[in-house]
């Protein structure tokens, strides 16, 4: 079991969000402060925004990234999709955002601040092993995840069956199995 091999810390993304702190750059800065406290290389696993943060960290701190598990990642933000998404968000009730730890206004601010993110030219800085995953039904992120895998020098792509974007909710057993198999392959 991977949990027996590693000291695991599982921060909640909302821990990096403070009042008036809902831009990507501010959340990323808080995330870096958190990760840089650890003296050993960190093994990062992130879903969606968490995957973007983990990838960004491995680019900026390649010596500190031991491995990455990126679930439903984007490396070049789909600007048009984000704009459509933000229009839809404006019509959604505030209650829809509570489960993800954001208020509606802050979530819209965050997604707007991410529109210009593009790590394409910096992907060669990622030196650690990377497992890229996507749910088989995640039509929005699957192509980007497959493309990202091809652009990284030490990456493997896995599709998680019977799941959409929230792989951890849709097929937690499949997710754990894929991570543990990958951990064994790269000797984590």
PLM region descriptions:
Residues 20, 163-172:
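Catalytic histidine-centered segment of alpha/beta-hydrolase-like enzymes
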């Amino acid at each position: 079991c991977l949990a027996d091999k590693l000291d695991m810390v599982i921060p909640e993304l909302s821990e990096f969000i403070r009042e008036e702190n809902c831009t990507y750059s501010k959340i990323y800065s808080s995330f870096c402060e958190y990760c840089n406290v650890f003296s050993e290389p960190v093994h990062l696993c992130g879903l969606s925004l968490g995957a973007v943060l983990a990838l960004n960290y491995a680019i900026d701190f390649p010596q500190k990234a031991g491995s990455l598990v990126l679930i439903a990642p984007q490396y070049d933000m789909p600007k048009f999709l984000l704009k459509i998404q933000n229009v839809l968000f404006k019509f959604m009730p505030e209650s829809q955002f509570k489960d993800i730890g954001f208020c509606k206004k802050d979530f819209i601010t965050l997604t707007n601040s991410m529109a210009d993110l593009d790590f394409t030219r910096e992907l060669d800085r990622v030196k650690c092993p990377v497992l890229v995953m996507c749910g088989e039904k995640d039509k929005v992120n699957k192509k980007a995840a497959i493309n990202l895998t091809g652009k990284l020098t030490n990456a493997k792509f896995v599709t998680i069956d019977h799941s959409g974007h929230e792989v951890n909710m849709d097929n937690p057993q499949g997710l754990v199995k894929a991570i543990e198999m990958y951990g064994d392959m790269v000797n984590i």
